[in-house]
């Protein structure tokens, strides 16, 4: 392998800094901020015409360098990238773009271990440019990146399958319970009218405090909002943090299969657990319910924007339990609910199976990544 200074084999371009009054609610170009980099949080727009190097487009290599860190091969069309994101342009005669992407994935923890800044941890452009990188031959780089991309492409395909299945389930929910397509366009008189709290018991999780005294490297899973926002599937099957058993006295332990709803940070987000976990007071759960988890999941997805509007405006940090308990709704007859569940449950079962496959593929990729980067796995004889 040959050793290089990162800035000598890859150009690092700064994005554009914006004043708040320049961020529009609609416009010609979306502005890619760090908040949109790892999720689909609220977007801002601009009508400004900028130099071409202030835009990124599909298959551009980007790196978020402030607050949240990491690389991405962009696939969201032409956007303006914010100042806290770099566009990286490799020298194609020396470095393969996709190999650099995986090198950055592998190296991000090391790269950011020495970050500095009084308000937000960040890297500087000089920090990145002065990194040392060892590169095999260009041919070998392309072999390594091809192996990893094959796995990532399968993961992406599975995510698209899941999104399609969920869209089908949401369309069925809308047809049955919003448009009443099977009931002449209106809710039947036989459906019980009331508020959500009449049909579902809503409770809040709990947090042992100070939480730092209970966090551990092993023990009981500790579900955070970030575990939910980092996955598009309805199901959560990976949780990063743990607490010790003493924390059980002041929290709520839920078994796999339970439905939870976020009520802080990113409120109104429903998820179904595929793993046992404790939940803090930023989560709501449903101890008893006359409605299935699948029905409730789709119900919460449908009313999420309305719940936000009932909070402190368009953006709020907490979803009050009373707002949810007093939300007007109805209880369809058992026959209708059984018919609906018989259609959507198989869709959710397929989503769950695919979500588990995604986890296995992710584990495989993350296991191969350091071995391929270090050369521990010799792929020189592979024909890829």
What is the predicted role of each segment?
Residues 79-86, 117-145, 277-283, 313-338:
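A short glycine-rich beta-alpha junction/loop motif
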Residues 4-22, 27-58, 81, 197-213, ...:
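Sequence-specific dsDNA recognition surfaces
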Residues 1-17, 130-207, 330, 334-379:
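Non-catalytic DNA-recognition/assembly elements of restriction-modification systems
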Residues 33-35, 47-107, 224-225, 241-304, ...:
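A short beta-sheet element
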Residues 125, 170, 225, 321, ...:
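ATP/adenylate-binding site constellation spanning eukaryotic-like Ser/Thr protein kinases
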């Amino acid at each position: 392998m040959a050793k290089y200074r990162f800035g000598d084999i890859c150009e690092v371009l700064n994005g554009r800094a914006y004043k708040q009054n320049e961020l529009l609610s609609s416009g010609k170009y979306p502005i890619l901020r760090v908040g949109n980099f790892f999720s689909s949080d609220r977007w801002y727009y601009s009508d400004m015409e900028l130099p071409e190097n202030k835009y990124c487009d599909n298959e551009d290599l980007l790196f978020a360098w402030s607050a949240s860190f990491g690389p991405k091969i962009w696939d969201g069309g032409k956007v303006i990238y914010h100042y806290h994101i770099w566009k990286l342009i490799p020298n194609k005669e020396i470095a393969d773009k996709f190999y650099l992407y995986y090198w950055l994935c592998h190296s991000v923890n090391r790269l950011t271990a020495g970050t500095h800044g009084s308000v937000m941890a960040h890297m500087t452009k000089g920090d990145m440019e002065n990194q040392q990188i060892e590169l095999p031959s260009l041919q070998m780089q392309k072999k390594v990146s091809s192996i990893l991309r094959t796995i990532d492409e399968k993961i992406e395909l599975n995510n698209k399958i899941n999104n399609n299945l969920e869209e089908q389930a949401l369309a069925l929910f809308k047809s049955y319970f919003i448009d009443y397509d099977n009931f002449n366009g209106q809710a039947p008189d036989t459906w019980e009218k009331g508020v959500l709290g009449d049909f579902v018991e809503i409770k809040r999780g709990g947090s042992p405090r100070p939480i730092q005294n209970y966090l551990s490297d092993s023990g009981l899973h500790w579900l955070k909002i970030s575990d939910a926002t980092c996955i598009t599937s309805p199901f959560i099957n990976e949780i990063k943090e743990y607490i010790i058993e003493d924390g059980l006295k002041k929290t709520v332990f839920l078994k796999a299969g339970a439905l939870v709803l976020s009520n802080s940070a990113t409120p109104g987000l429903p998820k179904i657990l595929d793993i046992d976990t404790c939940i803090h007071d930023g989560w709501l759960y449903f101890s008893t319910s006359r409605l299935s988890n699948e029905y409730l999941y789709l119900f919460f997805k449908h009313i999420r924007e309305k719940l936000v509007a009932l909070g402190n405006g368009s953006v709020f940090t907490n979803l009050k339990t009373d707002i949810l308990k007093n939300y007007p709704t109805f209880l369809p007859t058992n026959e209708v609910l059984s018919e609906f569940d018989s259609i959507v449950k198989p869709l959710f079962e397929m989503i769950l199976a695919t979500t588990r496959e995604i986890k296995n593929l992710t584990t495989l990729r993350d296991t191969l990544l350091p071995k391929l980067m270090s050369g521990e796995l010799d792929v020189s004889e592979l024909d890829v």
